Amino acid sequence: MNIRGAPDLGQPSDDPSSGGERERIRQRMKMVIGQLEGILRELKEVAKELREVVSQIDKLTSDFDFELEPDDWTTATVSSTSSSDKAGMGGPFDLGHLDFMTADILSDSWEFCSFLDVSTPSDSVDGPESTRPGAGPDYRLMNGGTPIPNGPRVETPDSSSEEAFGAGPTVKSQLPQRTPGTRERVRFSDKVLYHALCCDDEEGDGEQEVEEEEVGLPPEPAHTEAHAGPHKPSPAPYKSRRSPLTSRHSGSTLAPEQTRRVTRNSSTQTVSDKSTQTVLPYTATRQKARGKN
C-alpha cells in the first residue's frame, strides 16, 4: 500500500498490453504511409501522361492562327482547317463546296441571312416561274400605284362605287394581301354596276327633259356618251336625279307621274351608294312590260 492507503496496482503488469497496442498502431501508420506513397507515384505517372498529351495537342494545333480579331471568330469556328479538311476527304458526310463558308459572307450576319434567303430551293419548287416576284410586270404600278392583290383589272372603278371615293392608296396598302386561292367574295364589275344604275336612263331621257322644263330647270345636253361604251357612264344623270328632289323640298307641287319619276330616281341614287349588293340578271323595262301583257 502507498502513503494514501490505496492499493498499488503494479504498473509492470500493464506494460505488455500497452506495448502491443502501440505496435499495432505503428504498423497501421506505416501501411497508410505506404499507400499514400503509392498514390503519389501514380499521380506522378498521370502527370507525365498529361504532359505527353499536351505536347501532342500542341503539335496538332501548331498550324492554327489563334490571334484573330473578334469579327473573324465565326469564320474560325465554322471554317477551321481540321473541320474543312475532314469535310473534303470525301467521306459519307461530304457535302461538297459550300459557298457560305467564305469569310466575306460569314463576317456579316446580315449578308449570311440574305444568302440563306436567296439560296432556298423553295422558290423553285412552290410554283411556276410566272408566280415568282419579278418574273411578270409589277401590277402595283397600275391604277395609280395602288396595290392590287388579285392581279390587274381591265375596268376602271365606277364613279359611283366606293372604290373611287373611299380609301386611298395608303389605306389599301395597310390591308392584308389576299392570295389568289381565297377569292370567295364576288368582285362586281363596272358592267354590272352600270346596268344596275343606268337601266332607265336611255328610255327615260325624253320624259326627264319634259319634266325639267315643267319644273323650270334648264334642259341638260343630250346623253352623248351612252353609245361610247358601258365602262364610262356620264355623271350627268346623277345631277338630274338630285334636281327633282331639291325642287320638291323647295315647295313646288308635282304631278303624280312626276312624283313617281322622282321616287324612282331617288331609289336608283340609293343603289349607287351601295357597293355590296346582290347581282341580279338585267332585264329591260320594255321586256318586263311585254311579259306582263
From Swiss-Prot:
Subunit field text: Interacts with GPHN.
Record-given protein name: Inhibitory synaptic factor 1
InterPro entries for this protein: Largen/INSYN1 (IPR027997)
Polar residues bias (residue ranges): 171-180, 243-256, 264-286
Biased composition regions of type Acidic residues, renumbered to the chain: 200-215
Domain of life according to the entry: Eukaryota
Location(s), subcellular: Postsynaptic density
Principal location listed in the UniProt entry: other
One GO CC term on file: postsynaptic density
Keywords tagged on the record: Coiled coil, Synapse
Coiled coil: 30-63
A Pfam cross-reference name: DUF4589
Originating species: Homo sapiens (Human)
Region (Disordered): 1-26, 120-186, 200-293
Single Gene Ontology BP annotation: inhibitory postsynaptic potential
Sequence similarity: Belongs to the INSYN1 family.
Lineage: Eukaryota, Metazoa, Chordata, Craniata, Vertebrata
Role noted for this protein: Component of the protein machinery at the inhibitory synapses, probably acting as a scaffold. Inhibitory synapses dampen neuronal activity through postsynaptic hyperpolarization. This synaptic inhibition is fundamental for the functioning of the central nervous system, shaping and orchestrating the flow of information through neuronal networks to generate a precise neural code.
